[in-house]
A protein has these predicted regions:
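Short acidic/histidine-rich active-site segments
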Residues: 140-141, 166-182
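Core alpha/beta catalytic barrel or barrel-like domain that forms the active/cofactor pocket
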Residues: 4-14, 54, 88-90, 114-115, ...
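Solvent-exposed alpha-helices and their adjacent loops that cap or buttress functional pockets
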Residues: 46-48, 79, 106-108, 162-163
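Short acidic, glycine/serine/threonine-rich loops at helix termini
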Residues: 13-17, 99, 126-127, 180-182
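Short amphipathic alpha-helices and their capping/turn segments at secondary-structure boundaries
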Residues: 35-46, 153-167
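Alpha-helical segments flanking ligand/cofactor-binding loops in enzyme cores
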Residues: 75-76, 128, 158
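Active-site gating/metal-coordination segments in enzymes
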Residues: 1-84, 136, 142-146
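Active-site core of metal-dependent hydrolases
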Residues: 80-152, 177
């Protein structure tokens, strides 16, 4: 089991960060970076369990102010610690490209980034662009056929593997239980 730290938000930052940070009411260093680095170096919430992965998200709402702030904090924590990053993305809006751009601006080595949910797309140009920039493709969510049918997922993985991208794909699924609302 590998613990992660980060913030999973499609829009805003959690309330405790809303007024604290560069240029805000309480103008101090970004507190999310401090939190993430502490989780990695000392442990999460004084448990002694150290995070070994950073996580952020960008989905259909796009690069909102909150999403960008979290993503930049994740990037800065990565630069400070070297811990890899996984990003929840929306393949249909090609948000993996936006995530790569923001993280690269923060100095992130894109070969340390998994672009999650890349497997929701059969757009080979999009997927090759992500991989060619250095990131791993999260070919996940097998079984969530309403996002992309199983056969299309398998075909996409097979084609990319034949094209030399086998080492740039992480095969997984993104659900561990039954969801009655899917």
């Amino acid at each position: 089991i590998v613990a992660a730290t980060g913030i999973y938000s499609y829009n805003e930052v959690p309330f405790q960060f809303r007024y604290t940070g560069r240029g805000l009411l309480f103008d101090v260093a970004e507190p999310m970076v401090e939190l993430f680095v502490k989780d990695i170096r000392e442990g999460i919430a004084d448990t002694g369990v150290k995070a070994a992965l950073l996580k952020c998200a960008i989905d259909e709402p796009g690069l909102t102010d909150g999403v960008e702030r979290v993503m930049r904090a994740v990037g800065q924590a990565h630069v400070e610690t070297g811990v890899p990053i996984t990003v929840h993305t929306n393949a249909h809006t090609r948000s993996g490209l936006v995530a790569q751009k923001v993280l690269a601006q923060e100095g992130v080595d894109l070969s340390k980034v998994v672009i999650g949910h890349s497997g929701d797309s059969a757009d080979l140009d999009y997927l090759r662009t992500l991989a060619d920039a250095g990131s791993y493709l999260g070919m996940d969510r097998f079984g969530l056929d309403f996002l992309l049918p199983f056969d299309a997922r398998v075909n996409t993985v097979a084609v990319l593997a034949k094209q030399g991208y086998a080492e740039k794909m992480v095969l997984a699924h993104d659900t561990g239980c039954y969801f009655d609302w899917f």
